[in-house]
A protein has these predicted regions:
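A conserved beta-strand-to-alpha-helix junction within the catalytic ATP-binding
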Residues: 43-61, 116
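Conserved glycine-rich
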Residues: 175-176
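Short conserved segment of the HATPase_c
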Residues: 134-148
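Short alpha-helical segment of the dimerization/phosphotransfer core of two-component systems
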Residues: 17-22
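Conserved micro-motifs of the catalytic ATP-binding
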Residues: 3, 37-42, 80-85
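Acidic ATP/Mg2+-coordinating residue in the GHKL
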Residues: 129
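Short beta-strand/loop element within the Bergerat-fold HATPase_c
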Residues: 111-121
């Protein structure tokens, strides 16, 4: 079938990429199944908000910098503010949201801003990007299991439609809530409260 080394290499790359996509999908489905049936035990502890999110930003900052994405971090909570949370699962939340931002970033000069706000008895986290945005009729469904917007279904971006539903489940299991605002061509903001 492969009449040249170039074609063979192309086929091998395609097979490799599809196998990786399948592996990622299986892992997401397995995790979602466990979290949906409450089989993932949470390890809740007191977390210093400022330190935790500073560390998260440092971790994702290297990858974003390598991709040419500008990362802004704005902490508006006092240094001693604490929340009760599962640090590992909150990291999954941050990574899934930023992963989505990266996947649908359509600007040459991509920007992701993370803001931490004190809203009375709660901490609100906002992750904003300047990607392609989400249409208003699709916005209410982005946290639904397996939902993908029309534009993402017709793209080569991959994705299973599970990532943001995992994020929602984790936030709700923490007693919080999550929502999104977006403007087509301008970007999306994901907000959650703990």
């Amino acid at each position: 079938v492969a009449s040249s080394p170039e074609k063979r290499d192309k086929y091998i790359r395609t097979i490799y990429n599809k196998a990786n996509d399948m592996d990622r999908l299986i892992n997401e489905l397995t995790f979602y199944s466990k979290i949906d049936t409450n089989k993932i035990p949470y390890t809740f502890s007191k977390i210093n908000v400022a330190n935790y999110f500073r560390d998260c930003v440092e971790e994702v900052g290297l990858e974003l910098e390598a991709r040419g994405i500008e990362l802004g971090y704005f902490n508006f909570v006092d240094e001693d503010v604490m929340v009760i949370a599962d640090a590992e699962q909150m990291k999954r939340v941050i990574n899934n949201i930023i992963g989505n931002s990266l996947k649908y970033m359509d600007k040459k000069n991509g920007i992701i801003n993370i803001r931490i706000l004190d809203v009375g008895d709660f901490v609100q986290v906002e992750i904003e990007d300047n990607g392609k945005g989400i249409g208003q009729k699709e916005l209410p469904y982005i946290f639904d299991r397996f939902y993908r917007t029309d534009s993402s279904r017709n793209s080569s971006k991959g994705g299973s439609g599970i990532g943001l539903s995992i994020v929602k489940k984790i936030i709700e299991d923490h007693g919080g809530k999550i929502w999104a605002t977006s403007k087509l061509g301008i970007g999306t903001e994901i907000h959650f409260v703990l």
